[in-house]
Amino acid sequence: MNTVRVTFLLVFVLAVSLGQADKDENRMEMQEKTEQGNSYLDFAENLPLQKLEELEAKLLEEDSEESRNSRQKRCIGEGVPCDENDPRCCSGLVCLKPTLHGIWYKSYYCYKK
């Protein structure tokens, strides 16, 4: 009976000492995980910000392309069809209805003044 008590006491002491080591190890492991979790949270917070910045950069790039393409249209040369309501004939030209050879056409053309 004495050996049973000694064996039980020995097993109990080993369990407690190993349990403490596991507890310390678990605590350190939890600290590492929380530190990593914080870095993941920072990364997760920055990720949408990065996506928004990329989207903003794309939109600004499109705006700059639009501003490049929004320049005034080129003028229309002599003998080219034009719109009577919105003539874009070059300087020195006027948008007129064709005479003689172009009567059958239903559009206006740029002619010299």
From Swiss-Prot:
UniProt main location, coarse: secreted
Annotated S-S bridges: C75-C90, C82-C95, C89-C110
Localization: Secreted
Pro-piece positions: 22-74
Keywords attached to this entry: Disulfide bond, Ion channel impairing toxin, Knottin, Secreted, Signal, Toxin
Tissue: Expressed by the venom gland.
InterPro entries named among the record's database cross-references: Toxin_22
Signal sequence, renumbered to the chain: 1-21
GO molecular function, one term: sodium channel inhibitor activity
GO cellular component: extracellular region
Role, per record: Probable ion channel inhibitor.
Protein name as catalogued: U11-theraphotoxin-Hhn1a
